[in-house]
Amino acid sequence: MLHTRSAPPTSFLLRKMNAGRTYNVLFLCTGNSARSILAESLLNTLGKGRFHAFSAGSFPKGQVHPLAIDLLKRTNLPSEGFRSKSWDEFAAPGAPPIDFVITVCDNAAGEVCPVWPGRPMTSHWGIADPAAVEGTDAEKAIAFRKALMELETRVKLFTSLPIGSLDSMTLQARLRQIGRTATNTESA
């Protein structure tokens, strides 16, 4: 009788990701003008080199919302080099391999997404669209600040995950849990 030795069971992430590796994360929203831009800047800062964030949209607006750039500047987060772009750039040959795709708006979460090379882990972190707020300049600024605070809470939870030591089912559950995290932004 021939005995074969099989490898111990590991998740695709444990096989694919090892210690010291930078994880590529793609944040998606419809217009790629506010929420996904804020998330990209936050993760590239708070991820401290462990993560490289990108952002894109299903129907990019063509420009980043000026209040998003203003808020990034006022909070000392990176604000240069952002552009509103299509998610197709990240599904094309030669695109950076993406490990996580996170939608930050309900519209993008409900759309049929491209097939992402490498089958990244996905999650939805719904955040109200600050660009849709009508009212005074102060009310609009508050909406952007609230979105940034909610994203910051979730990004901090994400960066604290021991990704390399979690199996894929546990990691997926943790990502969903982060997406359901309520934040107290009433004082925004």
Residue ranges and their predicted role:
Residues L2-A188:
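Short polar/charged helix/loop
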